[in-house]
């Protein structure tokens, strides 16, 4: 029974993620430093990075909020204490 519960929990977490969010972080080949966010599938969190401005992929969001909505869906958002403040 415990095995089945674990299976369903893992299946639910991985099934609900948007496929774009599973792409790796790509900084790009240009030299700008635009603050952006990506979904880190290892930590299962949206994290900040500096985007170069060209190249890249769909796992690249202009805000923590946008990343969270795209990768977790329209659920309640809990901002971690160390999350960057949006201005």
From Swiss-Prot:
Its main location: secreted. InterPro entries: Kunitz_BPTI, Kunitz_BPTI_sf, Prtase_inh_Kunz-CS, TFPI/VKTCI-like. Disulfide bonds join 21-71, 30-54, 46-67. Residues 1-16 form the signal peptide. Residues 21-71 form the BPTI/Kunitz inhibitor domain. The record marks 31-32 as: Reactive bond. GO terms for molecular function: potassium channel regulator activity; serine-type endopeptidase inhibitor activity; toxin activity. It is found in: Secreted; Nematocyst. Keywords: Disulfide bond, Ion channel impairing toxin, Nematocyst, Potassium channel impairing toxin, Protease inhibitor, Secreted, Serine protease inhibitor, Signal, Toxin, Voltage-gated potassium channel impairing toxin. GO terms for cellular component: extracellular space; nematocyst. It holds the Pfam family Kunitz_BPTI. It comes from the Eukaryota. Serine protease inhibitor that inhibits both tissue and plasma kallikreins. Has hemolytic activity. Inhibits voltage-gated potassium channels (Kv). Belongs to the venom Kunitz-type family. Sea anemone type 2 potassium channel toxin subfamily. This is U-actitoxin-Avd3o. It comes from Anemonia viridis (Snakelocks anemone).
């Amino acid at each position: 029974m415990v095995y089945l519960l674990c299976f369903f929990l893992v299946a639910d977490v991985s099934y609900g993620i948007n496929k774009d969010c599973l792409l790796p972080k790509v900084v790009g080949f240009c030299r700008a430093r635009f603050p952006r966010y990506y979904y880190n599938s290892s930590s299962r969190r949206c994290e900040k990075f500096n985007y170069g401005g060209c190249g890249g992929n769909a796992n690249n969001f202009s805000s923590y909020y946008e990343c969270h909505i795209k990768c977790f869906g329209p659920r309640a958002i809990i901002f971690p204490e160390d999350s960057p403040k949006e201005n």
